[in-house]
Amino acid sequence: MSVPPDGDRTRGGDEPAAGSGLSRRSFLGYLGVGVAGAAVGAGATAAVGAAADGDGGDDVGAAVVAFHGAHQSGIETPPPAQAEFVAFDLPPDASTATVASLLRDWTSLAAALSEGASHELDPVPTLAGEPASLTVTFGFGPRLFDVIGKTGLRPPGVADYPPFQHDELQEEWSGGDLLAQVCAEDSVSVTHASEALISAAAGRAALRWRQAGFGRTVGVAEGQTGRNLMGNKDGTGNDEPGTAAWDQTVWASAGPGVPDWYVGGTTLVVRRIRMDLEPWYAASLRTKERTIGRELESGAPLGTDDEFADVPLQAQQPDGSLQIPSSAHVRLAHPDSNSGARMFRRGWNYSDADGAGLIFVAINADSTTGFLPVQSRIAAGDDLNHFTTAIGSAAFAVPPGVAPGQYVGQTLLEA
């Protein structure tokens, strides 16, 4: 891929661009909103992990996150170090009864594993005793609603999106009728839970794709922003979970066009973003900082000296040019550049034989008013597109949480 026009390809030698600014409050929820760049440069919260400072190994292994509640776990929950996304396809002749049976089993199994308890469907129960903050979050792809005869109950924004500009989507990382997002502080806990869910689905749903990601492991100091594989700070700008702004962005509420079963749910857009790291390594510091719109070392928006300062979108350099270039990622991802559109972002790094990058997760009550408009803007002109390419994309409706005795998706299946 080519580098941005203003980029020089020498290593080092450049003075860092002038500091820049964006206040934590006003920038919360902006950075990284949208395209490949949104996840990679502006901030995918989970790309850095969320381990508490000073936790011992025994405490980490025994930690439990409640499975039952008004919302599914794994959304508002602080993102742990390990994650796996497992997508399944339903057979063409799948019945509503078959889907309901599978979801009953998955719900029961996931609830037990989250508590560190054994379950009759767990093929390796000896691995269940250390959940390590395990969460399992289930989602429904767009075709599921057709399969069960409830097309009219599909939430807005749950669709197979066509490729955006610069996307090179591959079937092996895209689509799916069902999703299990499995997260924990320990990779054994994650893999064990994923394998148990796959085993329980046999004969009712077939594995479509599976991708694993990682962030910082337990021990990263609380309150610090970590970095993705490009060296950029990731996670600076999300709204704080539990706040009114966060709730409005994430949780579906009753209103026109919102199916009753979906109230209390949300939508996950999962994008696999490959990083073209060699050109990024070769780019100068000035090119990197002007591509993102932030200082590489501090994470401060150009023109400020504070990572959480307001992004000075109107600030100019002495020669009259914009302090933050018109094609910089933070400018194009900023809500002020997108009529206020925002999303909650999480992400995990990946590295395998095919390359390295980020598994980016955009979370919105309605992706048509958050992810989609921002993604479209970034896809059209973000300099970060010179270094990143989305190779996978899928959208899933996440049902609300359940009480003991209920199963995930029951309000839809029995609607």
Regions found by a protein language model. Name each.
Residues 1-22:
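N-terminal secretory signal peptides
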Residues 3-4, 21, 26-47, 52-415:
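Long, histidine/aromatic-enriched segments associated with O2/redox biology
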